[in-house]
Regions:
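Non-transmembrane, membrane-proximal soluble domains of secreted or membrane proteins
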Residues: 3-127
Length: 127
């Protein structure tokens, strides 16, 4: 059983994806940080561009106003892997977003599935 109990965190949704899903016409706060070099989070269609600075958390607000899928780019040359620094943002209407969100695992779901791993059960290591 998970030892650290946080009653307020059990319903947190755990997103494990390279894509960001957002609800249309709802303000969003983007937090950025970098552990290595300067990067830049850029979505041209949103007119949203912000540096990710090593050792600093930067942020900005925006509100998507058109549904669709948009490409996220790193707009700051950051090294040999720069060309591959891409992602996507999917902006959905309220109903589709609610459906997607309802399909995601919560922290409690994730812990329940990995209960043996959390308490150190060796059965997982034998598989």
């Amino acid at each position: 059983m998970y030892k650290r109990q946080d009653p307020y965190g059990k319903d947190d949704v755990m997103i494990q994806s390279d894509a960001i899903n957002l609800e249309n016409n709802r303000p969003v706060k983007i937090l950025l940080r970098s552990v290595d070099v300067l990067h830049n989070w850029y979505v041209p269609q949103f007119r949203a561009k912000m540096d990710a600075v090593p050792g600093v958390v930067t942020f900005y607000w925006f509100e998507p106003n058109k549904t669709g899928e948009y490409e996220v780019l790193c707009a700051e040359y950051c090294g040999v892997g720069h060309y591959a620094m891409r992602g996507s943002v999917l902006v959905q209407n309220e109903q589709d977003y609610a459906t997607w969100l309802g399909e995601q695992e919560t922290f409690s779901d994730l812990i329940a599935k990995q209960q043996d791993l959390v308490i150190g059960d060796t059965k997982l290591a034998q598989k």
